[in-house]
Amino acid sequence: MRSQNDKATWSILRFDHRTFTAQLASMQKNKQIAAIPEKYIYIDDCCYKGNGKIKEIILSSGCRIIGKEAFASCQLRKPVVFPQTVKEIKESAFSENHSLREVTFPASLEILGDYSYKGCTALKTVAFETSSECRRIPECCFHSCTQLSKVVFPEHLKSIGRRAFYRCKELKEITLPDTLEEIGLEAFYFCGFETIVLPKEIKKLDQRAFFGCKKLKEVYIPENIMYLGEEVFHGCNWLEYLEIHHDPEHIGSKIVNKNCTIRCKKGSKVDLYCEEQGLKREYI
């Protein structure tokens, strides 16, 4: 599967005879159910964008790519059933669907585009099927999905992008896969976590990754983490302890509030950091 950034390839496929276009979609503009005929395997950019009448989509059994903003600002009420042929959902494909409540991605999905479900304010459940090919949750993917409360991540996930779950305030508990290596800038900004267990292999927590997660009480930093970004746990008002047994290569400023105690080894780089930042510490 070629990259979602391969614009040249997609510009050619958009004119393929197997591509369902916005012109074809306009013939269904007054229908509540949009059914993509079987002969079409690509859905063009902006195909149904802004069509508030359509409540349900039936994809063709061989569908492979869903284009940019293809179903943006529709009001889908029924979950979209993705066939096991779907490889890519492009940027903003389902953004601003305020009635969509759940989504299950097929194991075949490799690429999920930036902003693809941004602003889906009724979305409660997101799940990736077992053995999912998806390795990355992209930038702003579920940004402002304010009712999102359950996420089942891909088994082989490597990274969570910038603001992927920004302001998902009902997201109180997640299980991150062991394969995860990086959590991006403000990825879980103002989420509702009460606990968080970071996987052992994780290497980077970018700036403000968990900023404002006010109900967090205690976090252990695994020893493979080499980068702790600025204000990574700042604004976590209930956070009592941040435990760091090793010395990351980079520790940004203000990683926690002043009322939080950092548990670390005496004489360590983290110990010196606490002294410089005026943070409380407790030796382990």
What are these regions (language model features)?
Residues 1-18, 28-42, 52-65, 75-88, ...:
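Structural signature of tandem-repeat unit edges
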Residues 20-22:
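A short, structured beta-strand/loop element
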Residues 24, 45-47, 67-70, 91-93, ...:
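Consensus positions within tandem repeat domains that build extended binding/scaffold surfaces
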Residues 25-26, 253-254:
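Short secondary-structure boundary/capping segments
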Residues 72, 189, 275:
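Short polybasic/polar patches that bind polyanions
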Residues 118, 130, 143, 211, ...:
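A structural signal for leucine-rich repeat
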